[in-house]
């Protein structure tokens, strides 16, 4: 009898014991570890209201002199440390923040620390980054961490690109392609430090 089930469905039902044979009965099957499931965070629909790419276009048309900064995340090994890239479009300069993981809590924490560090040197985050454009990654779902200062007052406008529309923020995408010339896809960042990121970021803009 021909099995008409998709491959993934067949494997799943096999592992659940729906067939007369078990993984232990297959010499090759026991060599492979089950794949880990990595749940990803998502951005609530309420957070996207008034912050979609169409809204961004309207905002920049009304405020053409406000410089934009593009945000994105470079992933190393899945589940490991990541790099959040910050590209200043007008000056064509990219910096990076080294994060322990790709979660909204970690991203919000690092942005908060950056704001405090800037304030300690007499700088205001909103003056340097008044406008942000990022993708739909769940790590950017804590909107207030990016938009508000320590007093809870808005200092920055954050907007999201449309899903699967990397071309809407082309500068970071171009830099990430060059970044991969230095650090190949799927290479772990766990041995990196912030100093490593500081060295790589300018190199990936050559």
Where are each of the predicted segments found?
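Short conserved beta-strand segments at catalytic cores or DNA/RNA-binding microdomains
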Residues: 61, 72-74, 79-95, 111
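Active-site beta-loop-alpha junctions of metal-dependent nucleic acid enzymes
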Residues: 76-79, 96-122
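Basic, flexible linker segments flanking DNA-binding modules
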Residues: 2-61
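Structured nucleic-acid-interacting core domains from mobile-element enzymes and related host factors
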Residues: 59-69
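Charged alpha-helix within mobile-element recombinases
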Residues: 1, 149-151, 155-206
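Short, well-ordered secondary-structure micro-motifs
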Residues: 81, 142-145, 171
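Acidic/histidine-rich, metal-coordinating catalytic segments
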Residues: 72, 123-142, 162-164
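Short, conserved catalytic/metal-binding motifs centered on acidic residues
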Residues: 1, 9, 72, 92, ...
């Amino acid at each position: 009898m021909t099995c008409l089930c998709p491959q993934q469905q067949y494997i799943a039902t096999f592992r659940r014991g729906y067939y007369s044979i078990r993984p232990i009965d297959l010499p090759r099957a026991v060599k492979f570890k089950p794949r880990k499931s990595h749940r990803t965070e998502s951005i609530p629909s309420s957070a996207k209201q008034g912050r979609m790419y169409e809204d961004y276009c309207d905002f920049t048309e009304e405020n053409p002199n406000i410089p934009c900064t593009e945000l994105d995340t470079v992933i190393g090994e899945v589940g490991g440390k990541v790099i959040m890239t910050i590209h200043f479009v007008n000056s064509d300069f990219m910096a990076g923040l080294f994060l322990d993981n790709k979660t909204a809590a970690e991203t919000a924490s690092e942005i908060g620390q950056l704001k405090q560090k800037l304030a300690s040197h007499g700088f205001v985050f909103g003056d340097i980054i008044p406008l942000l454009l990022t993708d739909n990654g769940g790590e950017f779902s804590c909107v207030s961490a990016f938009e508000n200062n320590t007093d809870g007052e808005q200092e920055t406008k954050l907007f999201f690109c449309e899903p699967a529309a990397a071309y809407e923020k082309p500068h970071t995408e171009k830099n990430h392609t060059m970044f991969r010339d230095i650090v190949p896809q799927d290479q772990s960042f766990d041995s990196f430090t912030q100093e490593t990121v500081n060295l790589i970021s300018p190199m990936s803009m050559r």
